[in-house]
Amino acid sequence: MSRSLYKSTLDFLISQSSIKAEGNHLRRLKTLCGMLCSCIKTQKSTLEGISSATDQSNSESALKQAKRWLDSKWSDWESFFAPYIIGLVQKAMSKGEIILVIDGSEMGGNCVTLMLSFIWGNYAIPLAWITREGKKGHFPEQMHLDLLKQVHHLFASPQRVILLGDGEFDGSKLRAWCNSNAWEFVLRTSKDHLVDYGDEIAPLSKLSPVQGHQFAFLEDATKGDHAIIWQGKGHSDPIFLLTNMDLGAMACRYYRKRFKIENLFKSMKSAGFNLHKSKVEGAARVGSLILVVALAFVLTICVGFLLKKQPKQVLKSFVRVDKVPKMSPILLAQKCLDKTFDLALSFFLNLSKNWATFFS
């Protein structure tokens, strides 16, 4: 691995660290830096992959350090991820609102992760996560709440916070928590969800749009929250939603953004960093591995955004220019890394040196 990539990334990690970079914390930052650079360059999430391109001359020593870092109780979100994502979160909130999307996905060996992302432009960015052992299935509602509470302090009033989620996240406790914290939400629910029609309690499926309209809106349908049946264009079946927004059309418009988290999972796995091929096991270790991959994702997508703004003569050195408008920033940056590494390196160096102003 180029020493310049390692050094510039380490300088970035040190400059943005919320803890003074000395002693054990500096040592942990150096190990993280090696794993992060390896993940970016090799696009792999295996233990061997994230330790194969570090500045260590002894690959066996690098592998042991990577294992220790992933297992360490000190390798936490507060110290090694939050300080580096806060600038992007603030940028996303610059227009007075932030959109959060929550969903689960299988990651690592025999583990499933509950992921909270935020929307920046047309892309979902990883924000926080909880990992547990087991195959994909619903998380307990308390875990949903634990994840939201973990990031609550990042969003100061009067920013508008909007939470989107599928049918797993329609629980009454989660909705009550959102209401008590002035968060708005649009959450999918089942057609069998019982709601109050005023004169009777009946399944939501009883509601139907007036002919010529795409949705029907039922006010105060359940514990003060509203219900929507949405038969949008391209929907083979109607979508049933719960929301505390007062306008049905607005709720449907926001809910469309929920599906962006699917592209995030795809980028972290098969179309990006191959997290699905990692054989790392154990909830704590997989959670730490996701931290490395999430940081690699953030840096790579930011470089991709920079590349999107470059003139054609720069882009044509590594990609067909006519393909760029529809290409994801992650893929664009990775193509640049694969075909013109020195060019990609120059953008990573620029990003690491100007991280604070990148979001201004």
Task: Show where each model-derived region lies.
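Single, function-defining residue in the core of a domain
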Residues: 1-44, 81-82, 93-98, 109, ...
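Short amphipathic alpha-helical segments
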Residues: 33, 47-48, 63
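Active-site- or DNA-interface-adjacent structural scaffold in DNA-acting proteins
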Residues: 40, 54-56, 60-109, 165-166, ...
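Short, charged amphipathic recognition helices of the HTH superfamily
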Residues: 42-52
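Short acidic/histidine-centered micro-motifs embedded in hydrophobic/aromatic stretches
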Residues: 53, 69, 267, 271
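Residue-level signal for short segments within beta-strands and strand-turn junctions
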Residues: 70, 118-120
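Short glycine-rich loop/turn motifs
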Residues: 110-116
